[in-house]
Amino acid sequence: MNLTLPMKKQKFLLIISLLILLSLLHQDYHIEAQNSDKVVNLPEQPLNPKISHFSGYVNVNQENTRSLFFWFFEALSESPSTRPLVLWLNGGPGCSSIGYGAASELGPFRVVENGTSLSFNQYSWVQEANMLFLESPVGVGFSYTNSSSDLENLNDAFVAEDAYNFMVAWFARYPQYKSRDFFIAGESYAGHYSPQLAELIYDRNKVQPKDSFINLKGFIVGNPLTDDEYDNKGILEYAWSHAVISDHLYDSAKHNCDFKSSNWSEPCNVAMNTVFTKYKEIDIYNIYAPKCISNSSSGASYLGFGVNDKSPAVKDWFKRVRWFEGYDPCYSNYAEEYFNRVDVRLSLHATTRNVARWKVCNDSILQTYHFTVSSMLPTYSKLIKAGLKIWVYSGDADGRVPVIGSRYCVEALGISVKSEWRSWFHNHQVGGRITEYEGGLTFVTVRGAGHLVPLNKPEEALALFRSFLNGQELPSSP
């Protein structure tokens, strides 16, 4: 009697059974993990519309127990299962994507004054996409590490690697989003974070196993720090052209500063320090908006850019020029009140042990951050050639990362113009200007918006975002 065939069949059936069992266990893990992340009974959450959201930690380094905190919102679209996934990053370095992006700008909930309640944001970007807000780098917001050396070694490469590891692990936890079109979005110093993460994903996709593949389609950045030379040149020219500084100060800075060099002369430092002191009476992030008057000990106290009126501290300019690119100080006060409530932290599954007090911006991150990359233009060139869709938008009332510098950066790429500079419209009014370039790059201005475009011009920001995602032209007529 030949028992060979039945034995082979038994082994085959055993293997199939084990694979099915492993698949079921894996599926159970996903369901259990997502259920544990689900946010229920968030204090002060509006009852309508019904919004499904999740929050928690993803470990990106087992050795140092380095964990990044996220807040994820499913799209409010009629078909959320078909909508893309968008990762949002705020800058600083050191500012929270939850305090700004999620709770003050484009998330579905906005913190109301004094952090006592939430209001529904009808112009939230969750109208168009599944939005994932990440507190990065480690040390920002609720994200934490058990190793102090992590905080001493932060630089752009470190941050990009952690963000990449986060996304790989997050997709393993939420596999239903793995095949979606994936975009990265952000503002300010995310002008570094976003393209660097995009580049890392692009490079890793070519060599990593299939289960680590990320379906990256492009990125969109607002008022982004891009190139030190052009950004700093733009700061000076914007301040002069918008009557913030005198002709004499402008001429002095222009004469003494070589913006191509990272080692500025003392006369240049003195001149540029003076430029920033002229902004102390107004809001540099939105020069036409009323200045928030607050005695809070939150991020609002940093608006002086570290300038000591009795001692210019010229040697500290390089840190000061990078001071938190992007916040409304009053909104940051409200966010700090809300996210330090014990009931809120418990609802969001945020640790109270590793993070004693949540801050909208962590100044120690800025002080220890190693600025090793002066220009993102080579990365832009690489990713444009790779075929990624890239949009740069700029609120034209921002004095910190002004539209002038961003225009210099885009022009320096040397890409042929596909569609000439024109106006775009929203609600029968000019929303801003737009230029399209060959290769998928688009530059858009938003009229009357400051550094935080979704906060200052929420309707226009949503229209712009919708156009970016859907590949639709912004209206060229009222």
Swiss-Prot record:
Entries under InterPro entries matching the protein: AB_hydrolase_fold, Peptidase_S10, Ser_caboxypep_his_AS, Ser_caboxypep_ser_AS
The keyword Glycoprotein is assigned to this record: yes
Any one GO CC term of the record: extracellular region
Transmembrane segments: none
Signal found in the keyword field: yes
Family recorded in the similarity comment: Belongs to the peptidase S10 family.
Disulfide bonds: 95-361, 257-268, 292-330
Signal sequence extent: 1-33
Species lineage: Eukaryota, Viridiplantae, Streptophyta, Embryophyta, Tracheophyta
Record keywords: Carboxypeptidase, Disulfide bond, Glycoprotein, Hydrolase, Protease, Secreted, Signal
Compartments where located: Secreted
The protein's name in its UniProt record: Serine carboxypeptidase-like 33
Active site: 188, 398, 451
Chief place of localization: secreted
EC number in record: 3.4.16.-
Protein purpose: Probable carboxypeptidase.
GO biological process entries: proteolysis
Domain of life: Eukaryota
Tissue: Expressed in senescent leaves and flowers.
Glycosylation site list: 114, 146, 263, 295, 362
Organism expressing this protein natively: Arabidopsis thaliana
GO molecular-function terms, A-Z: serine-type carboxypeptidase activity
